[in-house]
């Protein structure tokens, strides 16, 4: 099972987790680091008064959002997400997906998402690639592939979701 703490330093503050990424790309001014970290905590819906709290005091959903801030603060051109909602309660997943969708749109990010959850793929992806045993079985625009799957394996995936 996924652990949202992966990639976070649990013994330093939320602000430091974000700030470390800025320092890694050359930012040295403490005031700038702290204000940018505060801004990014807000963007991922973590209250600014939690900036000095350690991630171990956060819920799984908050840790996941902190990880998002940490990874996006340096404005990468490409982001890789491996099961971004894995290990989270369904109620938390919907909010996280909504947040991710907004950030991807606002920042104009290119994102590669690995997921077994077709709802996640539908919400976050313009294009989809369905793989089985390491081989591509179907690819194309997400809505087309999921609404009218051509490959038998894709048809099976889509129909198994509909029967749940």
Residue ranges and their predicted role:
Residues 139-140:
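ABC ATPase "signature
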Residues 121-123:
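A short, surface-exposed alpha-helical micro-motif characterized by mixed small hydrophobic
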Residues 32-49, 158-159:
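Conserved ABC ATPase "signature" region
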Residues 75:
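Conserved catalytic motifs of ABC-family nucleotide-binding domains
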């Amino acid at each position: 099972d996924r652990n949202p703490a992966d990639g976070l330093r649990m013994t330093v503050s939320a602000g430091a987790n974000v700030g470390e990424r800025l320092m890694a790309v050359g930012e040295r001014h403490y005031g700038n680091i702290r204000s940018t970290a505060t801004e990014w905590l807000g963007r991922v819906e973590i209250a600014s008064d939690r900036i000095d709290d350690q991630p171990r005091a956060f819920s799984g959903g908050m840790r996941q959002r902190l990880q998002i801030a940490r990874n996006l603060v340096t404005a990468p051109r490409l982001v890789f997400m491996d099961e971004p909602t894995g290990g989270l309660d369904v109620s938390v997943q919907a909010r996280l997906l909504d947040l991710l969708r907004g950030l991807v749109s606002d920042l104009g990010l290119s994102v590669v998402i690995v997921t077994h959850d077709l709802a996640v793929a539908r919400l976050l992806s313009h294009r989809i690639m369905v793989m089985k045993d390491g081989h591509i079985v179907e690819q194309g625009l997400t809505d087309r592939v999921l609404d009218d799957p051509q490959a038998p394996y894709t048809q099976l995936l889509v129909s198994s979701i509909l029967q749940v």
